[in-house]
């Protein structure tokens, strides 16, 4: 799993991660 020491680190990482996948994998998050 992920070892994230600070909440904001996860938030920023996920934000970038989501932005990269948004166009191609948007459906996975929307269901």
UniProtKB/Swiss-Prot annotation:
Muscle. Fe cation binds at residue 25. SUPFAM superfamilies: Hemerythrin-like (SSF47188). Keywords: Iron, Metal-binding, Muscle protein, Oxygen transport, Transport. InterPro entries: Haemerythrin, Hemerythrin-like_sf. One of its GO terms (molecular function) is iron ion binding. Myohemerythrin is an oxygen-binding protein found in the retractor muscles of certain worms. The oxygen-binding site contains two iron atoms. Monomer. Belongs to the hemerythrin family. This is Myohemerythrin-2.
């Amino acid at each position: 799993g992920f070892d994230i020491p600070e909440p904001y680190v996860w938030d920023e990482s996920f934000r970038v991660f989501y932005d990269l996948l948004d166009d191609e994998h948007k459906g996975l998050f929307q269901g």
